[in-house]
């Protein structure tokens, strides 16, 4: 049976939502620790509720009054902020009444319809840019309801198949803080794709879609290295860290003189070294590398074709990736989280960029340079004792050139229901693109255009005008010389 783990802070948040608004709802951000266990990372109340209804204490809001469009919008926006190891795993409802935790009530039946509506909206929204993951799409979700009247919690597993069904699942509020291990890598883009659209005006969004498909294909065929070495997929992250620790311990010499150096002291001395190398996890970072295969290995020789194309799409840049894993995650899951984070970040940048386009069509004769937003990171503020140990969990947002961190503050409040300090936002993880690179591209394009004109059989307009003026000047000079010669001969 599937189990959901929550912290005491989550219980206090549910109680707070019911006390302040009498009826609140929102999303659940979680992490898949293993096949049967999920960890709740964050609960975020939906802030797009009707303000007029909130002011009316006589109005009794129910699950049927929930705006599925607003909740789906929050779901999608939060998914863009989550690292690759986290997902929106469900929704929660917090109320002062007890019928929200009664399986026989009408509220429980309305919850099933709400999930069905939201899932349909999510599928429709994702159809244009594909899924956010390199794995299969998620179909099981969590429904969590809290009643302030009797301090009771109801937790169910919702499966979209077979018309949508609720099944039992366990939940526990744990006192022990959750432990997180941070992994970080940089993914370098430098690839050229052909534009096969033969029309004069090309849809740039369609070309971005082709780019996403290509990157996803490369990520699926890639290999992930941890600390510059290949690690077996079958072991878990905790065993990998222990193995690295044991390996370093064996390198420490054991002194037999003086009676002060022992195996225990060697283990203690090795911990700072492990921490400095980013091996033991905790507050340190494990460095990862995504290695792509050779292009010739991605396709068979029979798949190679010679085709005409109308232009090229050049991808250039670096994506900074940060994921946060549970010690019991398998290495296979860790690698998948890193790949998902890169793909999710790329899709999010493209979506944010395309949302700001006034005209998605460009001519295939022009040099079109796109600068998607860069990624910035922020930590969730905690009230009271921290609900986690080890690495501090971070979410991300995207800023265009010239935008201030205050944009992130507003987005975090609206989507994740957290109050951020602009000074705590990490904006240096990804730098701004170098303008000289764009200028060089433009100069190269100009040179290509000039060379095309030089090969023409027609003379340049500037050269024709010069020859015309020289001809007139020579004619005037000959005319003046003739007149002068005529006067000289006439005087004689």
Swiss-Prot record:
Region (Disordered): 251-270
Tree of life domain: Eukaryota
A Pfam family that the UniProt record links to this protein: ODR4-like
GO aspect biological process, one term: protein localization
Main localization, broad class: membrane
Comp. bias (Low complexity): 254-268
InterPro entries: ODR-4-like
Membership in a protein family: Belongs to the ODR-4 family.
Any one Gene Ontology cellular component term annotated for this protein: endomembrane system
Protein name stated in the entry: Protein odr-4 homolog
Role, per record: May play a role in the trafficking of a subset of G-protein coupled receptors.
Range of residues in the leader sequence: none
Endoplasmic reticulum is among the record's keywords: no
Membrane topology: Single-pass membrane protein
Location in or out of the cell: Membrane
Organism: Drosophila melanogaster (Fruit fly)
Transmembrane segments: 469-489
UniProt keywords, alphabetically: Membrane, Transmembrane, Transmembrane helix
